Amino acid sequence: MAQKSALIILAAEGAEEMEVIITGDVLARGEIRVVYAGLDGAEPVKCARGAHIVPDVKLEDVETEKFDIVILPGGQPGSNTLAESLLVRDVLKSQVESGGLIGAICAAPIALLSHGVKAELVTSHPSVKEKLEKGGYKYSEDRVVVSGKIITSRGPGTAFEFALKIVELLEGKDKATSLIAPMLLKL
């Protein structure tokens, strides 16, 4: 069986580093190939709290590659940049058309709204709740929400749960559960 793969899209500036790193790390522990793509190239991205992350590739170079999941980290202004990007729109449209999963955490669900990605139910950082509700989404305060092929989560403090849910969906509950003890997580 082929290894599952995840694409994490980094905004040019302002992605939430915990959501990028924790999500990617947990997925890698779950034996999922993780590709970090820079929206504005493969140069280091300055995240919301000042950390710099070096993408593996430019998003445009993997735009047509198939991934099991495309993940949008939150943070500001990173989430707004994702919401305004035509390239992100095209990647999400392709992911929906191919039946792949999409994950968005923190404020990143606003990119789902702006790019017309449908979901029955979402969650997010409280700062964008009203915008999502006004955009027609049914909203939940749950820490992680799975609605069809869309996985959303609330913010940095829910990044482990978000990532474990993705591992569960791609590799099964046993694989996800097996990762908890070695990371000393208390969920």
Curated annotation (Swiss-Prot):
Superkingdom in the source lineage: Eukaryota
Gene3D superfamilies: 3.40.50.880
Active site: 19, 106, 125
A single GO molecular function term of this UniProt record: glyoxalase III activity
Catalytic activity, reaction form: methylglyoxal + H2O = (R)-lactate + H(+)
One example of a Gene Ontology biological process annotation: lactate biosynthetic process
Tissue: Expressed exclusively in the intestine.
Localization terms from the record: Cytoplasm; Nucleus
InterPro entries with a match to the protein in the record: Class_I_gatase-like, DJ-1, DJ-1/PfpI, Prot/Nucl_acid_deglycase
Keyword Nucleus in annotation: yes
Keywords: Cytoplasm, Lyase, Nucleus
GO cellular component, one term: cytoplasm
Entry annotated with the keyword Nucleus: yes
CDD domains: GATase1_DJ-1
Residue ranges the record marks as coiled coil: none
EC annotation from Swiss-Prot or TrEMBL: 4.2.1.130
Family per similarity comment: Belongs to the peptidase C56 family.
Function comment: Catalyzes the conversion of methylglyoxal (MG) or glyoxal (GO) to D-lactate or glycolic acid respectively in a single glutathione (GSH)-independent step. May play a role in detoxifying endogenously produced glyoxals. Involved in protection against glyoxal-induced cell death.
Name of protein: Glutathione-independent glyoxalase DJR-1.1
Organism annotation: Caenorhabditis elegans
